[in-house]
Curated annotation (Swiss-Prot):
Lipid-substituted positions (N-myristoyl glycine): 2
Organism of provenance: Danio rerio
Protein name: Coiled-coil domain-containing protein 69
Stretches that traverse the bilayer: none
Start-end of Basic and acidic residues biased regions: 20-43, 120-133
Any GO BP annotation: spindle midzone assembly
Chain intervals for the UniProt region annotation (Disordered): 1-43, 114-133
């Protein structure tokens, strides 16, 4: 702040010296053009100095009005509508400071937004990756369990069919042998009774076949019940996993809300910092005004000593 003000004051003093030198050259030319008619009278010089002093006082009033203005637009309009060395310099300094502060704030805000976005993106990708891996593991385990159950059911079914076939053949052959042995021992009971025995044997075979079919159906039902129980257990596990996923999603949503809240807090901090920078700019303008006023007062006090040195050569 102090270094910048010293540069500004140096520029102001250089401009004043340059203006004084130009005025001295003008007066020298006027003296030469008068062709020995003498120097300007002290009255004319005093008028010139008074005009210059009035010009400076007018510019100081404009600067005072700029500092007491209620808004930035009003200040800029005052500086634009009243041209002058001091006003132009103050306007250029103010615009430069505003541009630098705005650029710094924009860069800081972009960096913070970029950092928050990258962090949020990385966390989201990590969560998606974990969810995909867990889903693949569950699908693979479910497929493996299903294949194992299918193989086990096929093995049990083939064994049951083989056992039933062997049992049916053994029973059929035993009944047939007993009937033939009874006929051979006691003789033929007659054609009628022989037909009755054949019919009874046929009915017994039908009943046995029905019992076998019902047994097979009962075994299938038992297998289906076991399968349903297994599927029910898998369903409960899937529901539990879904509940775990729901809890994780809620945690992720709360994390996202927390990140959003932190972003809003950072935005508020940036706004407060912007207001503080504007306040510092106003204080800087007030200090610049006081410094210029003090320098102009000092230059006004030394003006009478400058007049004789410029007139004496003639």
């Amino acid at each position: 702040m102090g270094c910048h003000n010293s540069k500004v004051c140096g520029q102001v003093s250089k401009k004043k010296k340059k203006n004084k030198a130009q005025e001295g050259e003008k007066r020298t030319k006027d003296i030469k053009l008068q062709d020995g008619r003498g120097t300007h009278s002290s009255e004319e010089e005093r008028c010139c100095l008074e005009n210059q002093l009035e010009n400076y006082e007018w510019q100081l009033k404009i600067l005072h009005a700029v500092l007491t203005a209620s808004g930035d637009q009003e200040r800029e309009q005052l500086l634009k509508d009243h041209p002058g060395d001091i006003c132009t310099l103050v306007h250029s300094i103010t615009e430069k400071v505003k541009t630098e502060i705005s650029a710094d704030l924009n860069d800081l805000h972009e960096q913070q937004m970029r950092s928050v976005s990258e962090q949020h993106q990385s966390e989201t990708e990590e969560l998606q990756r974990l969810h995909s891996e867990e889903k693949n593991v569950l699908n693979e385990s479910h497929a493996a369990a299903e294949e194992a159950l299918k193989d086990q059911i096929e093995d049990l079914t083939s064994e049951l069919k083989l056992f039933n076939e062997l049992k049916r053949r053994a029973e059929a052959s035993t009944l047939k042998r007993d009937l033939q042995r009874n006929i051979e021992t006691h003789g033929s009971p007659g054609e009628f009774w022989e037909q009755e025995q054949e019919s009874l044997l046929f009915v017994i075979e039908m009943k046995r076949q029905n019992l076998q079919d019902q047994g097979n159906k009962l075994l299938q039902m038992e297998a289906q019940v076991e399968k349903n129980l297994s599927l029910e257990d898998q369903l409960l596990q899937a529901l539990q996993q879904n509940e775990d996923f729901r809890v994780r999603i809620e945690n992720y949503q709360s994390l996202i809300q927390q990140l959003s809240k932190e972003q809003n807090d950072m935005q508020e901090v940036l706004e407060k910092q912007s207001l503080q920078n504007q306040k510092l700019i106003q204080e800087k303008e007030e200090l610049l005004f006081k410094l210029l006023h003090r320098r102009d007062s000092c230059s006004t006090f030394h003006l009478p000593s400058v007049i004789p040195t410029q007139v004496s050569p003639s």
